[in-house]
Design a protein with these regions (language model features):
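Active-site Tyr-X1-5-Lys
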Residues: 147-177
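N-terminal Rossmann NAD(P)H-binding glycine-rich loop of SDR-like oxidoreductase domains
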Residues: 3-27
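Conserved Rossmann-fold NAD(P)-dependent oxidoreductase catalytic core, especially the SDR/UDP-sugar
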Residues: 78, 82, 87-153
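NAD(P)H-binding glycine-rich loop region in Rossmannoid oxidoreductase-like domains
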Residues: 36-41, 46-100
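Glycine/proline-rich active-site loop of Rossmann-fold NAD(P)-dependent oxidoreductases
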Residues: 172-175, 187-199, 232-243
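A conserved pocket-lining segment of Rossmann-fold NAD(P)-dependent short-chain dehydrogenase/reductase
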Residues: 87-88, 144-150, 191-192, 198-220, ...
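Mid/C-terminal beta-alpha module of Rossmann-like enzyme folds, strongest
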Residues: 228-292, 310, 319-338
Length: 338
C-alpha cells in the first residue's frame, strides 16, 4: 500500500535529503514551498522520480495551501522553520512564524486525518539557559527561554516545540506527534543556496574567520538527520517521543584542524590562530556577532543521542566525515575558492 507523506519546507537543507530518501523507499511525497516558482529548480536538484513528488505553495505565516497539501496524507514531516543568516532586530521575526507555522501545520494535519506528525525541532530547545560550564543533556531537558541572553533562534525553537506539544495534548486527539532535535547540521551541500548551519565551515575555509574563539557545538550529518526522520515516520509507538540527533561536541579549533588535516592545500586559508576570551568580550561591546558568541566561551554542551540509537537503531557517520564532505562540496560548487 502506498504511503503518502507531506514534507514541509521542501527547498530546505534537511528536507531535500529527507525527500530523496522517502522517494527512494517508495513513499509518495508532497512538499511545500513558499512559491511554486521554486518547484522547477528544486526538482532539478532533488533528481528523484517526479511521479512520486508533488509541490504545493504554503507559507508558515498564512493558512492558504496547507489543507490542499495535507489532503490524502497519512504522515507529515514538519521540517520548515525560519533559520536566519544574521541576527534579527526583533525576536518575533523568528518566534512568530516558527510557533504559528507549527500550529498551522498541526491543525491542517488533524483536519486531514493525518496519523503521525514528526516535527524537526533543535537541540536549541534542549540545552540552553543553564549557565556556564560542562553540561550533559538528554531529551528530558528543556531550554529556559526566559533567561537573559537567549538568542531569538533559540527562543523560536523552544517556544515552537513547546507550543506544538501543548496543542497536540489538548487538541490532537489520536494523531501521534514526536520531535527530532538536531544539533549543528553539516554534510554535503546540495545547492548553492546553502543552509545557514554551514556558514561556519565556509568561513573557516575562505579565511574570513581569522581566529577561533573558544566555542563549539554538537555536530550531526544531514544524511543521518534524514535517516532519523524516516525511522520516526516508520516505527510503531512514536506518540510523544523526542529524539536528540547529535554526534560529539567539537570546538571550532577541532573543526579547523580536521579541515587542515584532510584538505591539504585547499585548506590553506583555514586559521591556525585562537582568539583569547578577553578580546571576544571587548569586541562584544560593539560587534553583535561577538556579543552572540561571548556567552558561549568555554561552554561544553554534550547532547546525548543514545535514546535514538537504542529505540530506533539510528546509526551515524563520524563527525570528521560530515565536516570534510561539507567542505569538499562547498569547494566543488564554487562557494569557496581555495
Amino acid at each position: 500500500m502506498s504511503r503518502t507523506v507531506l514534507v514541509s519546507g521542501g527547498s530546505g537543507y534537511i528536507a531535500g535529503f529527507l525527500i530523496r530518501q522517502l522517494v527512494a523507499e517508495g513513499w509518495t511525497v508532497r512538499t511545500t514551498v513558499r512559491s511554486l516558482a521554486k518547484e522547477a529548480p528544486v526538482r532539478d536538484l532533488l533528481a528523484v522520480d517526479n511521479s512520486r513528488l508533488r509541490f504545493f505553495a504554503a507559507d508558515l505565516n498564512a493558512d492558504a495551501g496547507w489543507a490542499e497539501a495535507m489532503a490524502g496524507c497519512s504522515h507529515v514531516a514538519h521540517v520548515a522553520s525560519p533559520l536566519p543568516a544574521s541576527v534579527p532586530k526583533d525576536a518575533n521575526e523568528l518566534i512568530v512564524p516558527a510557533r504559528d507555522g507549527a500550529l498551522r501545520a498541526l491543525r491542517a494535519a488533524k483536519a486531514a486525518g493525518v496519523k503521525r506528525v514528526v516535527m524537526t525541532s533543535s537541540v536549541a530547545a534542549i540545552s540552553y539557559g543553564r549557565g556556564r560550564g560542562v553540561h550533559h543533556f538528554t531529551e528530558a531537558d528543556w531550554t529556559d527561554a526566559s533567561q537573559p541572553g537567549i538568542s531569538a533562534y533559540i527562543q523560536s525553537k523552544t517556544i515552537a516545540e513547546r507550543a506544538a506539544r501543548a496543542w497536540v495534548a489538548a487538541e490532537g486527539g489520536a494523531m501521534e506527534f514526536c520531535s527530532i532535535c538536531p544539533s549543528v547540521v553539516l554534510g554535503p551541500v546540495w545547492s548553492r543556496d546553502y543552509s545557514a548551519s554551514l556558514v561556519i565551515v565556509k568561513k573557516l575555509l575562505d579565511g574570513s574567520m581569522s581566529a577561533c574563539p573558544d566555542i563549539g557545538f554538537g555536530i550531526v550529518d544531514v544524511r543521518d538527520v534524514a535517516d532519523l526522520h524516516v525511522l520516526a515516520l516508520n516505527a510503531p509507538g512514536m506518540a510523544g517521543e523526542r529524539f536528540i540527533a547529535s554526534g560529539r561536541f567539537m570546538k571550532l579549533r577541532e573543526i579547523a584542524d580536521v579541515l587542515r588535516a584532510h584538505l591539504g592545500a585547499e585548506a590553506n586559508k583555514v586559521t591556525t590562530r585562537d582568539v583569547p576570551d578577553w578580546l571576544v568580550r571587548i569586541s562584544a561591546l560593539f560587534n553583535p556577532l561577538a556579543k552572540a558568541v561571548v556567552g558561549e566561551l568555554g561552554n561544553v554542551r554534550n547532547q546525548d543521542a543514545s535514546h535514538a540509537l537504542a529505540v530506533l537503531g539510528w546509526k551515524t557517520r563520524p563527525e570528521e566525515q560530515s565536516i570534510v564532505d561539507c567542505a569538499r562540496s562547498l569547494l566543488a560548487l564554487g562557494l569557496v575558492r581555495p
